[in-house]
Amino acid sequence: MLSLYRYDSFNAMTFDLDASVVKDQAKAFGADLVGVVSAKTLNEFPPDPKWPQTPERISTHTKSVIVIAKRIPAGAFRAKSNIPVQYMDMLVLRQMDKAAYRLTEWLELEGHPSFVTAAQETDWSYKNASYGRLSTRHLGIEAGLGTFGLEVNILTPEFGPRIYLTGILTEAVIEADQRITEQVCIGESCSRCLYSCPSDAVRHFGIDKRACATEAQEFGFTTILQYWEHFIRQDADTMRALLRDREMFGFWQGLLRVVGSFGDCPRCLAVCPVGNDYHAHLADIQKVIPEKTPEKVEKAKGFKTARKNNEPIDGLNDWNARWVGPDGYQGMVARQLQAFKKEQREKEEAASAAASED
């Protein structure tokens, strides 16, 4: 059996399951990244204390949360429109949910009640449906998978922001991972996410959700409400015409395949230079950012100056700094790029040597 005693003879805490075994199982089921965080930590540090997104509000029995991530294949970010990314996201989420479900089944077979929450749904009672019951971004950070970027996506060293996450809440006590305290995001001196945002929604380690949604959810909930409010005020002929226009077709497509209604504008994800997937597949095509303007450049300079002068910044206050990386940026992306280039050289040299032997 994999289960261990909860306490040893000295009353020091041990664990119900070996964390490495749990992670191996999760990866065997399809997870690309796996981390563990204690429910106690999540309960003590809710993202927004006014609207606590904590395990204890869902189940008081939860002891640990296993966080799994699936990467979004980089090829979708080379397409000309959002649609390939949105459809690929749907496929990624399906695979992520399957992996989470299979891990939940395995945990219960080991004797530990477990369940998965809906990762991409929000709750109407949580700040007008702008929050879910848990913040998967914060779960990932607390589980040691990454830190916030300037646009407050979670950035992982492996795949940057090009991932989706979910959490398995379990009654098993599992050793938690350490948070990454180095800031993964290059920050204000990069600002590529800010430059690329078509709705100028990026704030200083924050996001204007309403502005973001105008691009991320072309056929989302707010758009549907506005459409029908407009529709019911029209005469019969106009109503018939509206039922046959592009927006109605978009709503139908969204119901069937999520495309257009899913919350994802891929621009900030596509241009982020964090992760070897960017260096391998995106650096060439995303080098130039068409949306970059002098106004956005000045905005980024203002962010940099504010941080240098230790001015008050909501996204970097004492509470939020925990998830940005309290140690600041120390060159992680540069180190990654050097390692990636070295690996590529070694592969090319090995291939060349093999070819010469033939």
Question: Across the structure, where does each feature detected by a protein language model lie?
Answer:
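Non-catalytic, usually N-terminal nucleic-acid engagement modules in DNA/RNA processing proteins
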Residues: 2-96
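FAD-binding beta-loop-beta segment adjacent to the flavin cofactor pocket
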Residues: 55, 302-303
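Short conserved micro-motifs at the rims of enzyme active sites and ligand-binding pockets
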Residues: 77-79, 224, 282-285, 355-358
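Catalytic cores of enzyme domains
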Residues: 85-86, 91-293
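Charge-rich, acidic-biased intrinsically disordered regions
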Residues: 224, 298-300
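Compact disulfide-stabilized, cysteine-rich extracellular microdomains and processed peptide cores
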Residues: 285-286, 290-297, 342-351, 357-358
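Long, compositionally biased charged/polar accessory segments in the mid-to-C-terminal portions
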Residues: 311-348
